[in-house]
């Protein structure tokens, strides 16, 4: 990585500042929409709150944002970039060689973050639309919650429907809109706070600690379940590191944090002034003059859409990284924009839409959604903390110091987890069940890969290259193709799967001029595209190690075209002059790609559990992207050959021949 690129990553610019507002802070920036309302509702309404309760609540929010978001994520986690990419899978990539078991927190964290993504668009958009109840001209329409639901579903349908076209153009508006949003949060919060300056006492952590044991807090420690809503976007902040750079996050976070805290203080000041009024409105909207509320609702809806968009895009990135790490099924990926980082996964998009829509229909109100929201993300944060401890040790921090530091954050997050656990019975089970389903798929997929690696046998190409040469020159067999390309995910030096040689020599001898063996290796760097070639001292066997970054499309034919030209230009591969062609001067023959697909056969070596894993993985494959699509072979000549997982395990079953009796035997 060049120093110039590294400097740009750590540099803050005015444009980067604006872009960061639109990409990084959507989730945490829309938390003021519902956090204070959740606190008031769980306390029993405005009439049940006191000054001590409000001061303590705001103090808890301020110190949660400081300890968890600022110190853990902004100051520590952002240092853990994998070639300028952030997020739990990038963090796992940095430390996975330190211990095999670290894949467990990576899977749990990724699954819970993905499941949380199904709830965030639902709660943010619903909260924004419910703000129309505070607009006198529209309150009569939106007092009917069905109209809120229908409007929310319409917005979500349009949002998810537009994903296939990318967000290149409209994405440029995200930053300016969020700049206005945060400015409004800060200004309105400041104006309201000036009416009750005593709210500034909330900066003192004493009020936060006192509230946890105060009898004025009706929910005790479980109030932290609502407090945690203020920092749910911290994990997304880390995940979006690669999109905007560390320097721009460092520059923009102080502004964002101040605006958010001012908003909470302003809402708290309004609550103190109206706690005896009996008003049943969201403090966020009620704290703004009636004449401005409709504009605030429009702005809040735009902010909610931007937050949802950032989360949807983040889900695509998360899934694509899991695929590259071979812990998630392969789904079709398209790139609607010019930027490789802007991707679209149809299956994930419409699955998210279905789950999000069902969430809106099931919970109906944002209050009910808030009761279920946040449980999954506490698990994600705990898993990130575990991985961060290993990262700090890897970077030279003394193990004891790293363990103590991360234990401090783990303690805080575990308390939040316990406080949020009560949400399980109030709808939190929805995201937990979804997360468990995702974990199940990840475990099956990863375990299946491990089982195949355990049982598949490898053979040396050097031991068979003489046979391959004889086959190439054996005119008794028709030419199968000029170039035959075998795609394999297991190749080490001259060792390849036995099933590949079985396909070439045994199944039906495949005569070709050149035999290619291509292994795609996913690198820790996001945008790598390099290769190594070993021809084993021949001009008819080419072993290619293709190194692609975890965010690069694995369109093998495009890369192979360049590799062929390089080899011919360097004289290592003979030119394949074509007598019949519509392309004058064509020097490359035709290609056929062969993919070997292992299937579970009757195999005594496989345990019952291993057989279950392999059969389940085979079932999952029915809804995943085919190897043809994944490797970009839709427009190439390609063949999928099915072979038993264990070629050596075609067992001789006990069976006896019934012989005809001779005359002597009959006598």
Curated annotation (Swiss-Prot):
InterPro entries: K+_transporter, K_trans_C, K_trans_N, Kup. One of its GO terms (molecular function) is potassium ion transmembrane transporter activity. Keywords: Cell membrane, Ion transport, Membrane, Potassium, Potassium transport, Symport, Transmembrane, Transmembrane helix, Transport. Its main location: membrane. It holds the Pfam family K_trans_C. It is a multi-pass membrane protein. It catalyses: K(+)(in) + H(+)(in) = K(+)(out) + H(+)(out). GO terms for cellular component: plasma membrane. Signal peptide: none annotated. It is found in: Cell membrane. The chain crosses the membrane at residues 16-36, 58-78, 101-121, 146-166, 167-187, 221-241, 253-273, 294-314, 343-363, 373-393, 399-419, 431-451. It comes from the Bacteria. The keyword Magnesium does not apply. Belongs to the HAK/KUP transporter (TC 2.A.72) family. Transport of potassium into the cell. Likely operates as a K(+):H(+) symporter. PANTHER family: K+ POTASSIUM TRANSPORTER, OSMOTIC STRESS POTASSIUM TRANSPORTER. HAMAP family: Kup. This is Probable potassium transport system protein Kup.
